[in-house]
Amino acid sequence: YQGVYPVKSNQDRFVVEDIVKFGSSFRFGLEAGSKPELLLAMSCLCKGNPEALLVCNGFKDAEYISLALLARKLALKHVIVLEQEEEVDMVIDISQKLSVRPVIGVRAKLRTKHSGHFGSTSGEKGKFGLTTTQVLRVVKKLQDSGMLDCLQLLHFHIGSQIPSTALLSDGVGEAAQIYSELVRLGARMKVVDFGGGLGIDYNGSKSGDSDLSVPYGLQEYAHVVNAIRFVCDRKSVKHPVICSESGRAIVSHHSILIFEAICLTAPATHNEPINIPFIMEGLSEDACADYWNLRDTAMRTGDGAFWFYADQWKQRCVEQFKEGTLGIEQLASVDGLCEWVLKAIGASDPVHTYNINLSVFTSIPDLWGIDQLFPIVPIHKLDQRPGARGILSDLTCDSDGKINKF
């Protein structure tokens, strides 16, 4: 096994350098998907293990390919992964001009597809990769150019946050068949790169039905080696080096954000005695009828109907207040009575607002932008059982600057 870290997951210099440093004994490499990422990866890997892989993915123009071939001259173990058929022509042409023998990989579009939020990049209609027909044409072009021995890696990607290991094993088995066929056609295959997809259990549910969780752990994920071994043994193909690009699994927990709860805003409560005759003085006939319905319901029916009439009465009173026919003191008493009704039937569910020294848009924009769920825990009073429901509200003027999903 030889993993690579996809730089796109977090391009922070210190994160990438630490991964190269601590992964050196494991020959752990980097994956780049653009020219800036490639330059960053080349710079960092010059200080890493010389056997570590530099996987070059993404859209490639002549400049990108020239940079990747330069990595070869720097003694980096680069692999140029073809994601579009026309890229093979540029690789052949530029490598001959620079007198560099490249290491080439192909990204295959598998039939295996998952239906989750991140599954759109997989399957025959996926965004990236070559179809079976295109792979065969690439093999033919490399053969005609005397460079078929340069083809050494097969790459595929089922999608991020793969929901089950059964789906992954199915895709790996399909890829192993393609790998074995490429060996049969004369390519000197060495590596199977099955991309990313190792999921993170963000919400702790261990469920395969949510985009925020997976029902497996690292050990179960590693069992996919069985699918590769089964195919290779059956076809008498030498076992490949297995490579993965698990960016989310490596860096999703790399940092911790600690913030202070400045103050607490508790739900408003009505402590004054409720004067029913005072309320009734200003009510319209319809509002009075709603009140008597509420009173009759309280004596003879269940909680559900009781709350229905209470809410209907409250809305009628609010409309009167908007029209100017009900005073603010009477409206406050109506709120107090409805609050008492909720408590009486056990439906009261007060939510506290904790004002936190934080800007959601600055520190955790993914929470707002893509509804990413972040594990949040207190750092004090851990010996006490939580007893209140709450919302975390930041100190900015943005109405979306709050955390209400946990």
Curated annotation (Swiss-Prot):
Its EC number is 4.1.1.19. PROSITE patterns: ODR_DC_2_1. One of its GO terms (molecular function) is arginine decarboxylase activity. Pathway: Amine and polyamine biosynthesis; agmatine biosynthesis; agmatine from L-arginine: step 1/1. Substrate binds at V192, D193, F194, G195, G196, G197, L198, G199, I200, D201, Y202. Its cofactor is pyridoxal 5'-phosphate; Mg(2+). Signal peptide: none annotated. The modification N6-(pyridoxal phosphate)lysine is found at K8. It is an enzyme of class 4 (lyase). It catalyses: L-arginine + H(+) = agmatine + CO2. Keywords: Decarboxylase, Lyase, Magnesium, Putrescine biosynthesis, Pyridoxal phosphate, Spermidine biosynthesis. CDD domains: PLPDE_III_ADC (cd06830). One of its GO terms (biological process) is putrescine biosynthetic process. Gene3D superfamilies: Alanine racemase (3.20.20.10), Lyase, Ornithine Decarboxylase, Chain A, domain 1 (2.40.37.10). Belongs to the Orn/Lys/Arg decarboxylase class-II family. SpeA subfamily. PANTHER family: ARGININE DECARBOXYLASE (PTHR43295), ARGININE DECARBOXYLASE 1, CHLOROPLASTIC-RELATED (PTHR43295:SF1). This is Arginine decarboxylase.
